[in-house]
Amino acid sequence: MSGTIVAKIRFENASYQTHGELPRIGSHAPDVSLVNTRLHDVSLMHWSDKRKIMYIGISVDSEASARAVIRFDEYAAGCDDIALLIVSYDLPFAHKRFGQAHDLQVAEGLSAIRHAGFGENYGVLIVDGPLAGMFSPAVLVLDENNTIVHREHLEDITAEPDYKAAFRALGIDIDE
């Protein structure tokens, strides 16, 4: 693994590290391949005509990630030009089950199971502690050209993202 340890996250009163850092605002998002709930490999080009909110989480089975996915889905409902991408190491089956169980309307579950480079390329790979190998929670907002217009790294895995800031980056006001 190349690069530096940059970000720190908290879990159960201890601090752990991630590899690298989130892509910078104004930079082009790395185009990676992920697995959707139909077991197809997809890249960011799959949503080339849409603006994107990418929520990266530990697992849809973790309380904090589940809460964030559900809230993002509620806020994104009715926004036809936005793709809500939920990325984790969960199996595609878990993403599908979660989406059905919570009647998600917009969120698209994406798994990194076939493409290990995602965590490193996006600076979210946890490198030590009990969650090593999983993704640190983060939010990236991309325009239709995949330029990053907002980023947020959650320093505590139980924290919720700033939903208003994510949608505001796309010119959308939401009520929390």
Please report, for each region that a protein language model flagged, where it lies by residue.
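Chalcogenol-based redox active-site neighborhoods
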Residues: 1-176
